[in-house]
Amino acid sequence: MKYLAGDFDVVVIGAGHAGCEAALASARMGCKTLICTMNLDSIALMACNPNIGGTAKGHLVREIDALGGEMGINIDHTFIQSRMLNTSKGPAVHSLRAQADKKRYSERMKHLLEKEDNVVLRQLEVIEIDVEDNEVKGVLTKNGAYFTTKAIILCTGTYLKGKIIIGDIIYSSGPSGLYPANDLSQSLLDLGINLRRFKTGTPARINKRSVDFSKMIEQPGDEKIVPFSFIHNKLDKDQISCYLTYTSEETHKIIHQNIHRSPLYNGSIEGVGPRYCPSIEDKIVRFPDKDKHQIFIEPEGENTEELYVGGMSSSLPEDVQIKMYRSVPGLENAEILRTAYAIEYDCIDPQQLDLTLEFKNINGLYGAGQFNGSSGYEEAAAQGLIAGINAVLKIKEKNPLILKRSDAYIGVLIDDLVTKGTNEPYRMMTSRAEYRLLLRQDNADLRLTELGYKVGLVKEDRYNKFLNRKKNVENEIERLRNMQITGKREINEFLLEKGSTELKKPISLYELIKRPELDYFKVEPLDDKRPSLSDDEKEEINIIAKYEGYINKQLEQVEQFKKYEDRLIPKSINYLDIKGLRLEAIQKLEKIKPINIGQASRISGVSPADISVLLIYMERKNREN
């Protein structure tokens, strides 16, 4: 029986990585927030890989942290190994990655929600969204509880009509054996929301006692641990190693012999899977010339023997999986604790959303995470944070927070989803960002903390720490520019020793650092007035000096980009009135409703000629008005 159970400013449906960030942001910005989850023990669940960060994803975590989100702080408290990836490449692609203690990560996030003043956490299944006159009114749960609200954020992950597939065994389920949400999809369809089916998968988990690590390559953590969160100066912890092994000729033979039993190839799987995270059977079919594939053996926590077999997700039948895993060097006696599986689920076409992550046709309804067609914990958390912030800003009748592509990877992520859409689970990559030298993980706080402070998520002590770091970096760069180095004998000897050329005339220390064979750290013996700075401040100064020319070029490109981004398109525009626009362009522009010319130019099917026609039309209208 339906009953009125309470009134909230914001209701968050789902407590995965998107839901947790959305609820915490909403509550910390002063809104009374209800977060509903199918199971209180699955909050911030890592249903697949036991790590946070990695290439481009580490950038997202740093940006979440800079804006006042929780993911970076949570992983800093619960990691068991930390590594900086891509250190042999330029700073634009340096990416922090940490192995998590999955259980502790989840437990700490759950405890944060329980302690947060403005959060009410409930184990409930929402089955219906109540909308009147295109505006959200409330949610109904399976228990009959009805909650009124001003905003709803859908963070349903892979639960909507979830379906587990292992060979020819198919059954209704959420991830990791949890219950699926089978009723909410129909409510969304009734509201006119377009749904689609996507697929993802996860590898088996095996018992550590059954693994022969002597046949594998050990991958320890970095000696110097770099925190994800800018609030942490240093972290120290005994780390647990990961291990690298490879598939064998026998692995490939077993898969080829049983490929007809794979749901991927016999038609059992309808959902579209992630291009950049294929199953092992998909890799072997798609890349027949490769005689082996990397397999990463990763611990799932400090107090468990479970190991994650990274790079070997599968939906093959269980009997085939056993043979397949045991054909990998070091896994000959592997005991499978959890079988690998594929999972299909309902999600939306994200082009139904605007850049705030609110549905265009339903006021107060937002989407975040895998529900929006993305993949990955970090992508989900980033969207949850932005959806939570914007839901509150709208309730408070303030301007929304819309990050541009030149502001953050989060801006690229949301713009790609909303403007371009996606036909497969979307994964963030550094190659998607046009201005990646400006969007480095090391400067995320310098780019975004001011915004986090303005919306109320970054508190005073954190903000003061940020201002101090910013001031230290600026002051040191100014000092280096003004400090002249002359060609004294001892200085030239030092330079020759470093493989550099002698000085013929005075030069600033800042210019000297730019030499390829030198950097801020190497010239310290020439700098007796160097102030005491933190490691991250030193790194920031070094990057700014070394890459100044490239950075300035990208800043010029951003200025060109902003000319289009600043040309706002009137909400009242009728594209049918614009003579010269092609039919496809009219249809796409009507569907996506871009807010500016820049966004319009990135829509697939809208040509440069269409943009020219649109600009001429807007100029004419401006003159008429």
Curated annotation (Swiss-Prot):
It comes from Clostridium botulinum (strain Langeland / NCTC 10281 / Type F). HAMAP family: MnmG_GidA. Its main location: cytoplasm. The keyword ATP-binding does not apply. One of its GO terms (cellular component) is cytosol. Gene3D superfamilies: FAD/NAD(P)-binding domain, GidA associated domain, C-terminal subdomain, tRNA uridine 5-carboxymethylaminomethyl modification enzyme MnmG/GidA. NAD(+) binds at residues 273-287. PANTHER family: GLUCOSE INHIBITED DIVISION PROTEIN A, PROTEIN MTO1 HOMOLOG, MITOCHONDRIAL. Belongs to the MnmG family. GO terms for molecular function: flavin adenine dinucleotide binding. FAD binds at residues 14-19. Homodimer. Heterotetramer of two MnmE and two MnmG subunits. This is tRNA uridine 5-carboxymethylaminomethyl modification enzyme MnmG. GO terms for biological process: tRNA methylation; tRNA wobble uridine modification. Keywords: Cytoplasm, FAD, Flavoprotein, NAD, tRNA processing. NAD-binding protein involved in the addition of a carboxymethylaminomethyl (cmnm) group at the wobble position (U34) of certain tRNAs, forming tRNA-cmnm(5)s(2)U34. Pfam families: GIDA (PF01134), GIDA_C_1st (PF21680), SAM_GIDA_C (PF13932). Its cofactor is FAD. SUPFAM superfamilies: FAD/NAD(P)-binding domain. It is found in: Cytoplasm. SMART domains: GIDA_assoc_3.
